[in-house]
């Protein structure tokens, strides 16, 4: 005999399955994509660049650039990936409620996220032949500072991310580093000049330091 708990679990699984299917159909309107297992869920990829994540019945879309500020305005929270001993917050935003209530407002955001992920992938593919000083906003002086802080190359810089690179540099130089370096590192990570960073994006970065 099936218990009430088992029935409720089955209903929840069916609802999750329907939600995922509706989201996949929604994304199809914007272009072709393929699915791969990621973070215990399903990652959505366009031209080998991941732009969305579906896991535990929740829908997440990749942030980056001006999209972050739009997600913040809409009250979307970042995805927290629970590891064995730590919780890592990654740049994917929970859009489950937004998809359920205002799917039309999500179309342009998902489209921009897809484009951002493709551009970043192209940028990262070209990193093998680049030096730190070749990144936007970086010069020889900053390259030396970053290397002294334990970030040896472009690959490591992009892997660690602007916020943690800034933390390392700030720690190495006694906590007396100009906050502009955070903007410069964020621009270098995104492939843009630091003056193009919008104020909401800067505030979001500051909150992570």
Swiss-Prot record:
UniProt entry tagged with the keyword Transcription: no
Keywords, in A-Z order: Competence
Keyword Plastid: no
Pfam families xref list: TfoX_C, TfoX_N
Disruption phenotype: Defective in DNA transformation.
GO BP term (any one): establishment of competence for transformation
Induction summary: By chitin oligosaccharides, but not with polymeric chitin or chitin monomers.
Family membership: Belongs to the Sxy/TfoX family.
Task performed by this protein: Required for DNA transformation jointly with TfoY (tfoX2).
Full protein name: DNA transformation protein TfoX1
Species annotation: Aliivibrio fischeri (strain ATCC 700601 / ES114) (Vibrio fischeri)
């Amino acid at each position: 005999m099936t218990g009430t708990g088992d029935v409720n679990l089955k209903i929840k699984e069916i609802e999750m399955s329907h939600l995922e299917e509706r989201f996949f159909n929604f994304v199809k309107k914007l272009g072709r994509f393929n699915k791969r297992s990621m973070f215990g869920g399903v990652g959505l990829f366009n031209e080998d660049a991941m732009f969305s994540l579906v896991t535990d019945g929740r829908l997440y879309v990749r942030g980056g650039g001006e999209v972050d500020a739009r997600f913040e305005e809409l009250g979307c929270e970042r995805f927290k990936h629970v590891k064995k001993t730590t919780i890592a917050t990654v740049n994917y935003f929970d859009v489950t409620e937004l998809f359920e209530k205002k799917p039309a407002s999500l179309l342009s955001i998902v489209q921009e996220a897809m484009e951002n992920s493709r551009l970043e992938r192209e940028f990262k593919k070209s990193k093998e032949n680049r030096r730190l000083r070749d990144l936007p906003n970086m010069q020889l002086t900053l390259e030396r500072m970053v290397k002294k802080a334990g970030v040896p190359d472009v690959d490591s810089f992009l892997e660690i991310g602007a916020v943690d690179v800034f933390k390392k540099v700030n720690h190495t130089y006694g906590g007396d580093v100009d906050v502009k370096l955070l903007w410069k590192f964020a621009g270098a990570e995104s492939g843009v000049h630091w003056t193009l960073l919008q104020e909401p994006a800067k505030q979001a970065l500051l909150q992570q330091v």
